[in-house]
């Protein structure tokens, strides 16, 4: 037996790897299984050029054997094995990757790839084991060797009888502590869960002897224990299968198996890319919003695999926030991993994959919009708000990606329409895309501000969600047509005769409007004759970037109480109320003041805004009734 020291800065570096690099102890099994898979891959590559070596895939597997009584966990593979020199080179030098060296020396063909990159995964076993023993026999050696270490300073190596080629790793599992339950790594159910989670798509069978119960023969209630060897992993991932061989049911089953949601997906996207970066992906657009979707607790991201091995549960960098509802996975052989294989280095490949995925999602949603409008509207009901947030955020930089996906209720069509559909129906005389805001389409339909636009025969988009107008403000225009609120001070559709009559009316009643403006000086910026009202007596219009609807939303937020829209009180000069108002101005200043307050409060109520003093409002009505 030889005793040797680690060649790298042993204790300090090993301690760093055990305690700092890996964030989850269960990762050790993933790393050891990946190493075992690498070892079998190496035989496969040798067989490509060595005619004397026959690669029969059925002869190659990985076996996991827990022994609770002895606190031993064995990981056995039928791979290429290691010579004494390779044991010292690969296990005696921390951060030395045998897989990487093999990969550099051989041209990889036939869709296979070696998983290992850094050679540190093996040492993750010291997170759960007090002693690690490696017994290996190389395909190039007549004898086997045993390598053993406690992970403290060095290791021992000695010849060992081993009949078959391959490697057996023996972990003596640590005793439990108050903080750590190491015994769980000897439980069948726990080991199965870890394998399914991280290594389900390793291309070779991962086998375990599973203990179970069954009815004894010729018995109805007497059970017996039995042990059955089972293959735990799926081996062939769905994303590597030919799309033409898969059915919608196959994708739906995968969606349910991965627990992406309890609904059925609206759409699946299967990507196989071989360009600047190679990757496979299966993405799903859910039917319903998760219960926590619009909360801080919700985490976006796709499962990320490196050559079939799960390395991240939720890689947020692969999805923009506005597509955070998308579920699924990405598998690539080209990713640059960091030393622990748990995290990605933010490299060009990841950005390319993310950009490609974004474009694929956009294209699929556009296809759904055109080919299955009912299904798209159901999707939009669930996630349309997120698309609008995507336009509003980041100063509108994403509007070109998202604007064609938006739907709004149309006053003319009485259904949801796209901006492009709205534009296609515009007459030559219509300059703007008109919209109205409110809590519901029923309330918007009753708004006085819609009268003139509707009379002109122009279509109005109804904005009923809090985010709607903020998104529209960021969009500013669509295909060179500006958006215009029906509450805007200038609608751009008043004819010259109306303009002339309004100017005349305002000049004749200049002092009246000045008096009303003075009485409401802390509430409105001006009072004037309305160009838009037809049957209603009064309404509010606004000037500036903050609309009345935006004021309602912003003022409800913390520290935003003082954000106000620049309101204009508009009076219908053709309404009987205006005649009463003029009479009061001439003959009864007290009544004129009451009328002014009442008309303003009436306009507030129409907009769904609160009255400042409901008691005073009620008293004013009573005074006028007496």
Curated annotation (Swiss-Prot):
Molecular chaperone. Has ATPase activity. Homodimer. The gene is htpG. InterPro entries: HATPase_C_sf, Heat_shock_protein_90_CS, HSP90_C, Hsp90_fam, Hsp90_N, Ribosomal_Su5_D2-typ_SF. This is Chaperone protein HtpG. The keyword Magnesium does not apply. PROSITE patterns: HSP90. It is found in: Cytoplasm. Keywords: ATP-binding, Chaperone, Cytoplasm, Nucleotide-binding, Stress response. GO terms for cellular component: cytoplasm. Residues 553-626 are annotated as: C. Its main location: cytoplasm. It comes from Alkaliphilus oremlandii (strain OhILAs). It holds the Pfam family HSP90. It comes from the Bacteria. Residues 1-341 are annotated as: A. One of its GO terms (molecular function) is ATP-dependent protein folding chaperone. Residues 342-552 are annotated as: B. Belongs to the heat shock protein 90 family.
């Amino acid at each position: 037996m030889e005793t040797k020291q680690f060649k790298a800065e042993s204790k300090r570096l090993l301690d760093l790897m055990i305690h700092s690099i890996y964030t989850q102890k269960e990762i050790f099994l993933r790393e050891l299984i990946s190493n075992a898979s690498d070892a079998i891959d190496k035989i496969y590559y040798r067989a490509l050029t060595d005619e004397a070596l026959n690669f029969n895939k059925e002869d190659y597997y990985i076996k996991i054997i827990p022994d609770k009584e002895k606190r031993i966990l064995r990981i056995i593979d039928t791979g290429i094995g290691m010579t004494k020199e390779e044991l010292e080179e690969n296990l005696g030098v921390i951060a030395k990757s045998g897989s990487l060296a093999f990969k550099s020396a051989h041209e990889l063909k036939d869709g296979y790839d070696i998983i290992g990159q850094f050679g540190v995964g093996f040492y993750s076993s010291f997170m759960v084991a007090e002693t690690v023993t490696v017994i290996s026999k190389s395909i190039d050696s007549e004898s086997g060797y045993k390598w053993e270490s406690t992970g403290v300073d060095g290791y021992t190596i000695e010849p060992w009888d081993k009949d078959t080629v391959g490697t057996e790793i023996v972990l003596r599992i640590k005793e439990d502590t108050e903080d750590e339950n190491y015994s769980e790594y000897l439980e069948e159910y726990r080991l199965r869960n870890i394998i399914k989670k991280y290594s389900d798509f390793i291309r070779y069978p991962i086998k375990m002897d599973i203990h179970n119960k069954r009815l004894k023969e010729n018995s109805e209630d007497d059970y017996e224990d039995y042990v059955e060897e089972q293959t735990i992993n799926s081996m062939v991932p769905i994303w590597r299968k030919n799309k033409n061989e898969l059915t919608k049911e196959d994708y739906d089953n995968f969606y349910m198996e991965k627990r992406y949601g309890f609904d059925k997906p609206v759409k699946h996207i299967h990507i196989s890319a071989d360009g600047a970066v190679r990757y496979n992906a299966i993405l799903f657009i859910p039917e319903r919003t998760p219960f926590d979707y619009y909360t801080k607790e919700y985490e976006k991201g796709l499962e990320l695999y490196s050559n079939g091995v799960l390395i991240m549960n939720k890689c947020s960098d692969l999805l923009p926030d506005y597509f955070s509802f998308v579920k699924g996975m990405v598998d690539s052989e080209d990713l640059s991993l960091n030393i622990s294989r748990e995290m990605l280095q933010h490299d060009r490949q990841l950005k390319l994959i993310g950009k490609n995925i974004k474009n694929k999602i956009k294209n699929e949603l556009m296809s759904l919009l055109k080919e299955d409008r009912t299904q798209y509207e159901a999707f939009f009901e669930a996630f349309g708000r997120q698309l609008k947030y995507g336009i509003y955020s980041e100063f509108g930089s994403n509007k070109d990606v998202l604007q064609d996906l938006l739907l709004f209720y149309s006053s003319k069509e009485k259904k949801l329409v796209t901006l492009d559909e709205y534009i296609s129906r515009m007459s030559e005389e219509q300059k703007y895309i008109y919209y109205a805001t409110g809590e519901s389409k029923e309330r918007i339909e009753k708004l006085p501000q819609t009268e003139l636009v509707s009379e002109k025969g122009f279509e109005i988009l109804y904005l009923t969600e809090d985010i709607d107008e903020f998104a529209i403000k960021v969009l500013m225009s669509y295909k060179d047509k500006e958006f215009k609120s029906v509450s805007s001070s200038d609608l751009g559709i008043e004819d010259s005769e109306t303009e002339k009559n309004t100017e005349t009316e305002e000049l004749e009643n200049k002092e009246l409007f000045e008096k009303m403006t003075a009485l409401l000086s802390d509430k409105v910026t001006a009072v004037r004759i309305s160009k838009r009202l037809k049957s209603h007596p009064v309404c509010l219009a606004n000037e500036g970037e903050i609309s009345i609807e935006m004021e309602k939303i912003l003022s409800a937020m913390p520290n935003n109480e003082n954000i106000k829209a620049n309101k204009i009180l508009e009076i219908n000069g053709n309404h009987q109320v205006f005649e009463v108002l003029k009479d009061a101005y001439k003959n009864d200043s007290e009544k004129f003041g009451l009328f002014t307050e009442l008309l303003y409060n009436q306009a507030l109520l129409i907009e769904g805004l609160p009255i400042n003093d409901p008691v005073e409002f009620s008293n004013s009505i009573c005074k006028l009734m007496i």
